[in-house]
Amino acid sequence: VTGGLLDEPVARAWAHGAQRALDAARERIDAVNVFPVADADTGTNTLLTVRGAADALDALPDGSGDDAALAALARGALLAARGSSGIILSRYLGALAGAARDGADLPTALATAAAGAREAVPDPQDGTMLTMAAVVAEAVRAGGAAVPSGEGPGVPGDRAVPGAEAADRSAAVLAAALDVGRGALDRVSAAHPVLREARVVDSGACALLVVLDALAVALATAGRPAAPTAGTIAGPIAAPSAPQVDLDWLPAAPRPSGDRACGVPITPGAVEVMAVLPGSALPDLADRLHGLGDAVAVVAGVDADGGPVRH
């Protein structure tokens, strides 16, 4: 990493690594999707959202710069977002990218992302990807604080460390925090009554952990190209011993059958409405839509021309 937390090569590697990982994890994540709507599409929706970020970066000429790459990542995710999980993830990615552009360290960027994702939902629910975002952010903060000054993210001295070394340290702290998140997944999910009754983990939390694992790999390898390893999903890797996105922890739940998903009735006759609206004078849009739908999320961003939009 040549500049701050995320430079252009790492942003590109992260987006593509997350896309590959979610593509491989999609069916397992879909299978445990019972909240907010039991429609078995969280894995698919988060994959499409991340694919939009990767496509936006592909459309950007190499060497466009860190700020342009981060803006493209955020905008691509926003405009491609599908479903409530995709909208929330797009807001998370946008807030993280924005914090990175502003020079934030890893703990600050993840805390900003967690707060931004929660703000996207008019009725935030604990026990979901929103809670997992906060758990990982806190674990990163605690992990960074435990590293001696100048030797880890979250401390002023890290800004003086050469970029690749700082990225390695950020990757190590994030990887450790993701271990905490995976270890807390059952407990976090059990905090939500629907998930507790269905005895499943939250699908959105699973997707977020996969996306952040891809970030840890991208940071650890500074955006270098990858080669796959059996049983894993390749991230941006240059050596056989380099880290991979591990999906073995994901639940192996059965696909929905008939009218039930993990024992929860599949919502009948549901209609999903997605819209990208120009303009920013819509401060009460989420509240007004909340009274009309089961799962509402509204995210603000900018279009390709820099104009304000809401999705």
Task: State where each predicted segment sits.
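N-terminal loops that bind phosphate or other acidic moieties
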Residues: V1-H311
